[in-house]
C-alpha cells in the first residue's frame, strides 16, 4: 500500500498508538499522518504524549481545537470537578458512563474526513473498540459504518474508515503490539488514564481495562 495515504485519529493512548504504528508498517511512514483533537479534555498529558510520540515516530501531526465542546456538553472527561465513575466497566450495561463525551467520535471522524480530503487521503484509521468499549455507543462498529456512509455521501468522496481494533479485547490489542515488536514502547510511552496521572491511577475504567488486558496478554505469553 505504499502508493496510498492514511490518516490516523491519534490521542497518544494505547489504542491509537497501536493503530499509528500499524499504519506506518502498512502504508509507510511517509504516507501516514496523525490528527489530534483538543476538545477540552481535563488534563494536558494526553496531548503532550500524542505530540511526543508523533515526533518520535517521525509522523506529521495536526492538532485541531474543538474546545467549544465545553460550551455544549458536560461529562467527567471535560469537567475537573466531576468524579469519574470507577465502576463504569461493570455498570455500562445499565447506562452510559459519565466519562462518555456526546458526539466526540462523530466530530472526530467528521473533521478527520474534511482534513483527509484536503490532503488527498482516503484511508482514515480510528482505534475505537467494541469489545472493551466501556459502554460508549460511538465505539460500536455499526456507528462507524454509518459514519463512513454518511461522510462518503456528504463529501462525494470514497473514504474508507478502518478500525483494526474493533473486535479485539485489550489483551489481543496488547498481543498485536507484541507481534509488531512494540509492546514495551506502548507500555512505557502511551497515556490512558482518565485522571491524567502519568503511569496510570489503576482505578479509572480506562486504567483497569489496560492493566487487565496487559496481565492477560503476558499470562498467555507465559503459557506458550
UniProtKB/Swiss-Prot annotation:
Residue sites binding Zn(2+) per the record: 193, 201, 204, 207
Give the species: Neisseria gonorrhoeae (strain ATCC 700825 / FA 1090)
State one Pfam family annotation. QueC
Full protein name: 7-cyano-7-deazaguanine synthase
* Pathway(s) of this molecule: Purine metabolism; 7-cyano-7-deazaguanine biosynthesis
Top EC class of this enzyme: ligase
HAMAP family for the chain: QueC
> Which residues does the record give as ATP binding sites?
10-20
Taxonomic superkingdom = Bacteria
Q: Which reaction does it catalyse?
A: 7-carboxy-7-deazaguanine + NH4(+) + ATP = 7-cyano-7-deazaguanine + ADP + phosphate + H2O + H(+)
GO molecular function terms listed in the Swiss-Prot or TrEMBL record: ATP binding; ligase activity, forming carbon-nitrogen bonds; zinc ion binding
Q: Which residues form a coiled coil?
A: none
Biological process GO terms, please?
queuosine biosynthetic process
Similarity annotation: Belongs to the QueC family.
What InterPro entries is this protein classified in? QueC, Rossmann-like_a/b/a_fold
Q: Which SUPFAM superfamilies match?
A: Adenine nucleotide alpha hydrolases-like
EC number, as in UniProt: 6.3.4.20
Cofactor(s) for this protein?
A: Zn(2+)
Its biological function? Answer: Catalyzes the ATP-dependent conversion of 7-carboxy-7-deazaguanine (CDG) to 7-cyano-7-deazaguanine (preQ(0)).
